[in-house]
Amino acid sequence: MAGIPDEVLIGCIGKIIVATRGVAGPGEVLVRVRGGSETFIAWSAEPVPKGATVLVIESRGHRAVDVSPWTDPLAEFEEDDRR
């Protein structure tokens, strides 16, 4: 993993670049870590569409992670500030 320990990925936010199919199969996620971006195989409990923002909740090792859909809780406040 280019020197990045698996545990570092947990809690990172990523963008789905290949949709996941839930238990039917993985997709792919782009995660920003340590000043760069890397792709990982992404597994999820439910299907997640391409373009969705996700949270890495577990590492499976060997460049594979479990993800969950994520909505930034501060996004609502940022939208209010723009009005």
Regions found by a protein language model. Name each.
Residues 2-81:
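Terminal membrane-proximal soluble interaction domains of membrane-associated proteins
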